[in-house]
């Protein structure tokens, strides 16, 4: 069903509701068409998932017979979790005739017992597996062999791919690399939001995926293109959003896609011409809705960690967190304590490091923190 609001904050519908990224899309299409896997790196909420789905949409337009798969492994905690998610995403999706699908699954997946159910509308089998820890590696190999046996060209996107480095099992990277490297009909997009970890995985000569992909790092959508997209959709609804007001929104959040999109979604929903007063009202509404969540989140951190978080938020971006001027300006503790606090905030992704310095990961949380007193 066509969205009521053109400014989507989750999911993907069609190119009509997707802004720009023409160069990045072209890069992905060219790589996949020519048999190259892609390592797609972007901060969370910059739009990498939408870009993947847009690229898959375009691929299906050009080659209707291909099969695309998308799995987000952010919540997986082990190889077993990964295998079960991979199985439920892939198994049964390569054949249009249910009986043929069942036959092929049983032919390849022998290390565990698949459980089949059927979609009431399409008849396509849905498969879940219960795999014993001792069989996880074999089951993963069988699923990949099942993909490789298809006469169809397949494209698989694995989002938050760096999560496999957190699994307790050793050697998952090497295992996966060894299973996929000789597939002739399957290509992968490995997408991730932890930039340093992803770069280490794909550019270090010591890692299994070294030089096995074409790297692609994305940043904000071009401001002019985004402005045309936004003002155009308001205009189609007989509403006015001036380029100056859009620019103020874009610059406030430095083009970070989800936050810009979230605010535009609110403004469009008000069904009024947009002025700066309405923008301020929308921001107040959003921060009010998140305020309890943010306050509750801070309860898990020490006073020193919270104080550092607020200090970074007040500055916006801090080049040297351990600099004496910064520590004294916000009456922080000793440099060693600040260093330990920073490490904790980085690990929990409340703060992230850019080329310019340290920033609050959640732009709305940063704004909420700036409104809080010390």
For the regions a language model picked out, list residue spans one by one.
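Short, locally clustered residues in the helix-turn-helix/winged-helix DNA-binding domain
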Residues: 32-33, 254, 268, 310-317
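Short regulatory helix/loop adjacent to the ATP-binding pocket of P-loop NTPases
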Residues: 195-213
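A short, basic N-terminal segment
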Residues: 1-38, 43, 61-62, 352
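P-loop NTPase nucleotide-binding core
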Residues: 42-46, 50-155, 336
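C-terminal leucine-rich, beta-strand-based interaction scaffolds used for sensing/assembly
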Residues: 2-7, 292-374
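Amphipathic alpha-helical "lid/sensor" segments that cap RecA-like P-loop NTPase cores
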Residues: 227, 231-293, 303, 355
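Conserved Walker B catalytic segment
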Residues: 126-194, 203
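Conserved AAA+ ATPase "SRH/arginine-finger" region at the nucleotide-binding site
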Residues: 214-225
